[in-house]
Amino acid sequence: MAYARAVLTTASFALMAGCGLFGSSSDDAKPVATCPTAAILRPLSQTAVFAPGAPTQPVGVAFYGVLSEVTVKCERAGDAVRAALDVVVIGERGPAAQADAMTLQYFVAVTGPDQAILSKRSFPVRVSLPSGAKRGGITDHIEETIPLGGRPPGDLTIVVGFQQTPEAIDFYKHFRGR
């Protein structure tokens, strides 16, 4: 009885070990990405909006904008990808704030494997702050069709950042931000 159990166990292990020999996938095969990677460009993840006539210093900031998160879902469409992006945009009152809403401008760009920009579009987004609140946010949903030009989707990257004004660029040269 013990001998039969040992033979059966050994045969079972041999059978299971052989299962991998006949599989259709190899260790060298990489799964094909259906979606480009999406990322926020950290140097452009924040912006500052100044009150009219205010200095480009912290006391002159009416609102700060922060790109908090981006997610992407894709669907293949021939030699293109239909991408649905959700971009979380946060608005924060600055010392010179006098309103309860702000319009911020961010961009979505597609880059190739060499980081060259293949396409870029800007999107305005209005962020409202409840009365008395320091911060507010919105999830902006956009849909884009990205031509692949024969490339696999995984070779492309979707990058998101604020379109900076000259005042914001000058501000961030001299101050670290919020």
Residue ranges of predicted features:
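Bacterial N-terminal signal peptides that target proteins for export
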Residues: 1-11
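C-terminal motif of bacterial Sec signal peptides marking the signal peptidase cleavage site
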Residues: 15-18
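Bacterial signal peptide processing site
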Residues: 20-24
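Post-signal peptide N-terminal segment of mature Sec-exported envelope proteins
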Residues: 28-53
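Low-complexity, acidic Ser/Thr/Pro/Gly-rich terminal tails and inter-domain linkers that flank the onset
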Residues: 56-78
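Mid-length scaffold segments of soluble, non-membrane domains
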Residues: 74-117
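Short, solvent-exposed, Trp/other aromatic-anchored flexible loops in extracytoplasmic proteins
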Residues: 124-156
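Short acidic/polar inter-strand loop motif in beta-rich domains
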Residues: 163-173
